[in-house]
Amino acid sequence: MASQLSAMTSVPQFHGLRTYSSPRSMATLPSLRRRRSQGIRCDYIGSSTNLIMVTTTTLMLFAGRFGLAPSANRKATAGLKLEARESGLQTGDPAGFTLADTLACGAVGHIMGVGIVLGLKNTGVLDQIIG
């Protein structure tokens, strides 16, 4: 076993900080096959990936704006009922939808969209939709 390991690679020899020659492999090691990373392409505006992302972000913003999701001015109680409270944030929106609510709902919508896209890609359904 030790002779096989020593025969696979040679030890480089040094003189100071420089090597005499580059180490050469006496035997080639089998190449390891790597798993390809998955990628998502969003080629055009009407692509399925783009439609999924726009839909989930829009639905989450709609839910936050019209009181279907917790926001800065509506907190969720133990029974998941939403009750109004004063947050101290100024807004020009009649429903009280603030900038923080917009950013939070947009981020959650994107997270949901990415989860849906990657899930469909992993199951192979998104490949069938694309072509």
UniProtKB/Swiss-Prot annotation:
Its main location: plastid. It comes from Hordeum vulgare (Barley). This is Photosystem I reaction center subunit psaK, chloroplastic. It is found in: Plastid, Chloroplast thylakoid membrane. The chain crosses the membrane at residues 49-69, 95-120. It holds the Pfam family PSI_PSAK. Signal peptide: none annotated. GO terms for cellular component: chloroplast thylakoid membrane; photosystem I. Residues 1-42 form a transit peptide. It is a multi-pass membrane protein. Keywords: Chloroplast, Membrane, Photosynthesis, Photosystem I, Plastid, Thylakoid, Transit peptide, Transmembrane, Transmembrane helix. Belongs to the PsaG/PsaK family. One of its GO terms (biological process) is photosynthesis.
